[in-house]
């Protein structure tokens, strides 16, 4: 990062994958401790293996996780460490509140069918994973003063995990977990995979907040399904919502929150590479409710400042717009009302705004 960040004030981040934000040095450390051999031994070499620097396909991007997830998954110390270090990283980026998402099943090695990352069976269940991440986040918050909460992900290709995910959301509802998410291949719709619909219905019944990856690479119909069938309160990405103007207008009217990830959207091929033609420009023009987020900073070799710089440089974002979108992020976050109020007050104070200032 050269010089001053694009927005040097407190920020809120709502869409970042914990397992897409792991320090590569940590991967090397843990591999050494666990006696896991990697094809490379230097951080720079591992970076070359794990990052996407030019627009790729979503499949190529997802393939990057297989280079390091097997090192972290199924190891108590490692899972807690990545959570703790995540909070440290976010604090350095000026984030005062972050919602990190992950699939508890992808970090477990017991009670998961099939076992991910070709692991041997062990003793860490998805339930243990949530507990370990919570510990790391709590210690991180004490050390770095940045508050982190979890969103647990269902995976589109694993509908048989989804009911377990919602049960974990319920179990840890008062302990660090604020919502449920659905991630993965958008072509796998909920009609064909009813496990997700069932889980999200249970989430609605149990007052578990809901966000859904939709309209990232998939069409606007996936966004409609997320809102109408899964009762999503926020949309992860949602760029392709613009292809259905009626839906877009309806969601604008409903003040639906869109978790925007500009750097990610270019590198996964979700949007065309030219940032000056990005859908976010339309969302900004229409004063939509959205946030700026990194998504998977390790894989994109980015920080939150990268996203702020990109929109400042190519989409004419101003300091005022940065304030507006962070206030919107805080208003749309999944914290309990009292904590949300406190977060908003922190932002109003830091931004020199009176509480009544409305955008």
Curated annotation (Swiss-Prot):
Membrane-crossing segments per the record: none
Binding site for Zn(2+): 15, 17, 213, 295
Compartments in which it is found: Cell membrane; Cell junction; Cytoplasmic vesicle lumen; Cytoplasm
Lineage: Eukaryota, Metazoa, Chordata, Craniata, Vertebrata
Cellular-component GO terms for this entry: anchoring junction; cytoplasmic vesicle lumen; cytosol; external side of plasma membrane; lysosome
InterPro entries named among the record's database cross-references: A/AMP_deam_AS (IPR006650), A_deaminase (IPR028893), A_deaminase_dom (IPR001365), Ado/ade_deaminase (IPR006330), Metal_Hydrolase (IPR032466)
Cofactor note: Binds 1 zinc ion per subunit.
E.C. number: 3.5.4.4
Protein task: Catalyzes the hydrolytic deamination of adenosine and 2-deoxyadenosine. Plays an important role in purine metabolism and in adenosine homeostasis. Modulates signaling by extracellular adenosine, and so contributes indirectly to cellular signaling events. May act as a positive regulator of T-cell coactivation.
Site (Important for catalytic activity): 237
Membrane disposition: Peripheral membrane protein
Organism encoding this protein: Danio rerio (Zebrafish)
Keyword line: Cell junction, Cell membrane, Cytoplasm, Cytoplasmic vesicle, Hydrolase, Lysosome, Membrane, Metal-binding, Nucleotide metabolism, Zinc
Family according to the record: Belongs to the metallo-dependent hydrolases superfamily. Adenosine and AMP deaminases family.
Residue numbers binding substrate: 17, 19, 184, 296
UniProt GO molecular function: 2'-deoxyadenosine deaminase activity; adenosine deaminase activity; zinc ion binding
Entry's Gene Ontology BP terms: adenosine catabolic process; hypoxanthine salvage; inosine biosynthetic process; negative regulation of adenosine receptor signaling pathway; nucleotide metabolic process; purine ribonucleoside monophosphate biosynthetic process; T cell activation
Protein name: Adenosine deaminase
């Amino acid at each position: 990062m050269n010089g001053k960040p694009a927005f040097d004030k407190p920020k809120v981040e709502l869409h970042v994958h914990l397992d897409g934000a792991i320090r590569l040095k940590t991967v090397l450390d843990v591999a050494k401790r666990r006696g896991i051999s990697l094809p490379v031994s230097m951080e720079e070499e591992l970076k070359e293996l794990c990052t996407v620097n030019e627009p790729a396909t979503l499949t190529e991007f997802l393939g990057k996780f297989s280079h390091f997830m097997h090192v972290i998954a199924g190891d108590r110390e490692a899972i807690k460490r990545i959570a703790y270090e995540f909070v440290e990283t976010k604090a350095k980026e000026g984030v005062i509140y972050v919602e990190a998402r992950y699939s508890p099943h992808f970090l477990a090695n017991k009670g998961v069918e099939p076992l991910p990352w070709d692991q041997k069976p062990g003793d860490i269940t998805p339930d243990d994973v949530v507990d370990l991440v919570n510990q790391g986040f709590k210690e991180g918050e004490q050390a770095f003063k940045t508050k982190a909460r979890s969103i647990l992900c269902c995976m589109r290709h694993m509908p048989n995990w989804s009911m377990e995910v919602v049960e974990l959301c319920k179990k840890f509802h008062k302990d660090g977990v604020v919502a449920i998410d659905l991630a993965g291949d958008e072509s796998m719709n909920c009609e064909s995979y009813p496990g997700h619909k069932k889980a999200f219905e249970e989430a609605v019944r149990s007052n578990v907040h809901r966000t859904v990856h939709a309209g990232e690479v998939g069409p606007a119909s996936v966004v409609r399904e997320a809102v109408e069938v899964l009762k999503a309160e926020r949309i992860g990405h949602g760029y392709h919502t613009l292809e259905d103007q009626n839906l877009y207008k309806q969601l604008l009217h409903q003040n639906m929150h869109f978790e925007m990830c500009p750097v990610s959207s270019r590198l996964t091929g979700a949007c065309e590479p030219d940032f000056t033609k990005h859908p976010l420009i339309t969302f900004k023009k229409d004063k939509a409710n959205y946030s700026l987020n990194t998504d998977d900073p390790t894989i994109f070799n980015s920080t939150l400042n990268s996203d702020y710089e990109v929109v400042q440089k190519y989409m004419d974002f101003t300091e005022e717009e940065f304030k507006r979108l962070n206030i919107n992020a805080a208003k749309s976050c999944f914290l309990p009302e009292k904590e949300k109020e406190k977060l908003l007050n922190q932002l109003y104070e830091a931004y020199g705004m009176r509480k009544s200032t409305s955008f």
